Amino acid sequence: MVKIELDIKGISWYIETTLETDTVPAVGDIIIVDKDCISALYRAELWKIPSNQVFKWVDEEEDMPVMEWFDNDTEMLVNKRTWKYDIEEEETVCILSVKFIHCEDL
């Protein structure tokens, strides 16, 4: 099993997956990531970065952004795929650099 790390505009986090090395998405593939695949720990870390365009503030009184772009049909394009080995965890990690696909991008 491969650990998957997603990178969107410089923000990286791990997603839960059961992919094997030979089934990891390649450059040019379109992937869908449900927000439920992001652990609570990484979700909390991502919420600390309100300046990222991926997030939208609920309102100014609530001090918490919403990951509005992550839903069941959010498509992302894989721009780059790199591999590394996590010595501490003793497992292979695949880093997928992705960007959101908007209607105007098609």
Please annotate each region the language model reported.
Residues 1-13:
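Short, basic/aromatic beta-hairpin or loop at an interaction surface
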Residues 2, 72-74, 90-94:
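Residues at beta-strand starts and edge strands
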Residues 5-7, 18, 96-99:
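Short, acidic/hydrophobic/Gly-rich beta-strand patch recurrent on exposed beta strands
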Residues 14-21:
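Short alpha-helix capping/helix-loop boundary micro-motifs
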Residues 29, 33-88:
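Acidic, low-complexity, intrinsically disordered interaction modules
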Residues 79, 87-106:
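Short solvent-exposed strand/turn elements
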